[in-house]
Amino acid sequence: MKWWEKMKNSVAKPEETKRLKSWKTKYENAKAKYSDCLDTMRLYDSYYEGSHAIRKDNMEARKKATSVWNIVYELIESQVSSSIPMPKVTPVHEEDVELARRIEQFLTQAITRLDLKGLNDLQERTTPIQGASFMQVEWDSNKGTHCTDGDLSVSTVEPEQLIPQPGVDKIENMDYYFIRSSQTKAYVKRRWKKDVSKEEETDKEIRVEADSEDLVTVITAYFKNDEGGIGLYRWCGDVELEYLEDYEARFVDACTTCVDEDGSPVLMENGVCPVCGKKHSKRVKDEMDTITTYAEVEMGTTVDGRPFTKETAVEIKLPYYKPSEYPIVIRKNISKKKSLLGCSDVEVIADQAEEVKKLNTKIDEKLLKAGSYVTLPEGKGVETTDEEMKIIRIETPAEKALIDVITLQADTTQDRIFMESSYNHAKSALGITDAFQGKYDASARSGTAKQYSINQAAGRLESKRVMKNRAFADLYKKMFKFALAYADQPIPINILGEGGQQTFSHFDKADFIKTDASGAYYWNDEFYFDIDETSTLQTDRAAMWNQNDIKLQSGAFGPIGQTDTMHLYWTEQARNCYPNAGEILRQVDEKLAREREQQMQMQQSQMIQGGMPNEMPSM
């Protein structure tokens, strides 16, 4: 933007210009103090991508490796897990058990709906490379179904996109943080109705390396406001895009002049004020939520004195629910004190990766420079023709004795031993064994020993699994809070019943309204969010089917061949979604009903034939 355009804007909107200048200063200061960490991120990425650069004493690359054995990529990929930790919700109050079950099912269905599997697949790489990764929860009003307005949105935020407040190592303790993203100028125009055609891209390092004049850098600042809520400020270059002092509040269009009897602004209807008919509006905060519920209201008494009730619609007004916390979740690799990010796997094995590159290059040079050499008498040569037989012209038998071939073969034994040692050192540092990688393990001479070796490696990696579970538990908590705040229509969910049948219900925020001891309404968000440790087996349906087969054969369901036994078995199979299990269970139930009916008929016939037990004997 030209200097005279900046001057024009500063005169026209002094408050906006002052605010923009203040936030840009904070951003530049935070970015400068975070620059070393950003440089380290790019270095770690280069290791994973198999960079040929050979560094010396943490300095710039001075040499290129001829080939790369990418142990960083290999060891990180060995740890990738595609499993998604499933939510476990525990209510604080006994009467909220059913609500907790609905929350669990709502979150479980959101995993597929929001493609959290794809997000997890990306973070399984990013987290060990950079030491941490981030997930952002938002409410997207443009999503939803025919019957719902909006839906949750969960996206990944790359570590290099986030600029933290200097000196603070926990997100929840920060007064503010920044997220930078690359957007097209057309997208900015569509979403925020601001022209940024004259702005330039300032942070090109956060995207793929491809020059484009259509891209700009959008900076978003999240901050804590004076009321304890969350605010948002967004800009692009020298253009303010959005400023929300209360980011989580709701705003509506109201008339600039008209007010109600209680002094509140009159809301616009279809862009027109219903009082004065003008179209001039302003954005005002919508404080109160109106929820319609149904309650049994006593209408009187019947003739016999019993109370007569009727289900009547009741309108409840209470302040809109707000999450009041940052919409971002951090997933650390390994905890590291005095650091926002965790400990990176690349940081741990970088020295070994450099050694492997150097030794691999040294071995290549030795092998490529080795070869065979011919000794000839002085002054003699070999004809260089395409003929099969080459002619060497000699004069005496003594000259023939001087013709020889010398083969020079390099010894790379020690180099290979050293390189293998560096590789094993890297694996040991990360706690990865050959058995864990699925390779041949000479130390494991039986299946039990091999499983023990795998379990040992899994134990070394337990901390990473705990941090992953913690991050997803925090994610599920924020997803619930955002749904409670912004899901104005009930969201359909289906719940698997005890008999394997599906029952359909809704996640309705009206169900989370309670009254305290004084009779005041409040939003019930008193639930504990954790991860179901048994979810891996429960989500592996084939494993559950096999477990049921084993239990059937062992007699856990009862004697094999009896209908009661088959009823229990197929009930469990239906609960675990075995194909056609519901139809088979129905047929088993019909057979069981017929057998019980036959038994009753036989008992009745026996009683008739044998007489009544207390019948008097005939004289």
Segment roles from a protein language model:
Residues 1-57, 127, 135, 141-147, ...:
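C-terminal anchoring/interaction modules
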Residues 1-291, 297-303, 313, 414, ...:
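Extended, helix-rich architectural segments
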Residues 56, 62-68, 83, 321, ...:
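Terpene synthase/cyclase
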Residues 93-100, 317-320, 334-338, 352-354, ...:
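A broad, low-specificity signal for short, low-complexity segments enriched in glycine/proline
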Residues 129, 156, 215, 322-325, ...:
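A short, structural micro-pattern
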Residues 275-276, 308, 319-328:
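Hydrophobic/aromatic interaction determinants used to assemble and anchor large protein complexes
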Residues 326, 333-335, 342-355, 359:
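Solvent-exposed, non-transmembrane regions of membrane-associated proteins
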Residues 340-351, 410-418:
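Short alpha-helix boundary/capping segments
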